[in-house]
Amino acid sequence: MADSSTDSADEGPSPKRRHLEEENTSSFLEPPLPATIRDLANLLEIPLDDCLVPCNFCGNFLTHLEVCEFDEKKLSLLWKDHCVFACCRVCCAATATYEYNEFYESTVVGRDIEEITGKSIFDIDVRCYTCMKFLDSIEKLDICGRKHFFHKVRGTWKGICRLCKHFQ
């Protein structure tokens, strides 16, 4: 006769043992995974040039320039089953266009964004609707001063960065 304290293959672990295992795993916290490619390179102790990160959408590895742009745009790495993915320049532009076309909500002119949000322009997070770069204060003030548009897309504000405005 089998000992009642052992787990049978059919029944799995006992409720008491399962609770103990859950307790042990929940008390062990994994360190946070890096959010930027530079942080990933530092964690792996390799030069940024040696970081090969695939694009989540097309699967191509990002070039060194795209790696630098990814971090400059303040985008975050995507982790799936402890595998890391980023987004290449072409897929960033395609994703930005898709989001704008599918999830557009509203448009405001220049400084009206402050009235709508109740925040200072310096406290509003804005990304480029073309390349997804995080806009700096000068770029946001330029949009306000020229009375250009801010667009609300998928609950976040979009404008145009200094580089993309020259290609429109």
Curated annotation (Swiss-Prot):
UniProt-annotated location(s): Host cytoplasm; Host nucleus
Predominant place of localization: host cell
One GO term (biological process): regulation of DNA-templated transcription
Zinc finger boundaries on the chain: unnamed: 55-91, 128-164
Chain segments carrying region Disordered: 1-31
A GO term, aspect molecular function: DNA binding
GO cellular component: host cell cytoplasm; host cell nucleus
One matching Pfam family: E6
Highest taxon above the source species: Viruses
Alphabetical UniProt keywords: Activator, DNA-binding, Early protein, Host cytoplasm, Host nucleus, Host-virus interaction, Inhibition of host innate immune response by virus, Metal-binding, Modulation of host cell apoptosis by virus, Transcription, Transcription regulation, Viral immunoevasion, Zinc, Zinc-finger
Its biological purpose: Plays a major role in the induction and maintenance of cellular transformation. E6 associates with host UBE3A/E6-AP ubiquitin-protein ligase and modulates its activity. Protects host keratinocytes from apoptosis by mediating the degradation of host BAK1. May also inhibit host immune response.
Cited HAMAP family: HPV_E6
Self-association state and partner proteins as the record states: Forms homodimers. Interacts with ubiquitin-protein ligase UBE3A/E6-AP; this interaction stimulates UBE3A ubiquitin activity. Interacts with host BAK1.
Family, per entry: Belongs to the papillomaviridae E6 protein family.
Name this protein carries in UniProt: Protein E6
